[in-house]
Amino acid sequence: MTLPADARYSVDVLFNDYDSTYSDINKASLLASVKAAKDLNADVIIAMLHWGVEYEIQPDEMQNKIADMLFQNGVDVILGSHSHEVGPMEKRTVTVDGEEKTVFIAYSLGNFFSSMTEGTSQATCILNLEFTMDAETGETAISDISYQPVYIADNGEGAATRYEVLPIRSAKASSAFADLTPVFNEAIATLKKNTGSSLDSGN
């Protein structure tokens, strides 16, 4: 895909070579955005990236390379999308400008509302991130991370409501969704496996 010249203000692209190999990272644009946030004295810098391969759960080498670059340049949190599947979530300790800090990445948050049923894409989540500012230093840091398991139910073509976004644990407590209990349990297990974490808020 080659972007027309007059589309330069409509998107911030990850790569300079969208029409070929997706290997030339658009470092200048990415780092300019990070610098702009720093210049505003942002308490937290969060990068939201549309990346990865559809229905692939594990990140590829290029995603890891981009994540490392962003973290080393001051980004605190990376939230990914595009694959339609919830991907790995992890906290890291990085050293930036000689100081250690905790950063977080969610490679893909999956779908929030969708009619897709491919793979395990109906098992999704809502991410909860908490930040705390030190009253003395003014430094802001990640203080809590969890996710709420969610399931996108397809009730069929004849249903009054075809698709529903169901917070799994509250839905499990309702008799209205008793027949979905095995599906909910499987979704919880899938999310734990896909994220490679114990960040489920129900743990």
What is each stretch, according to the model?
Residues 1-203:
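Acidic, metal/ion-coordinating pockets
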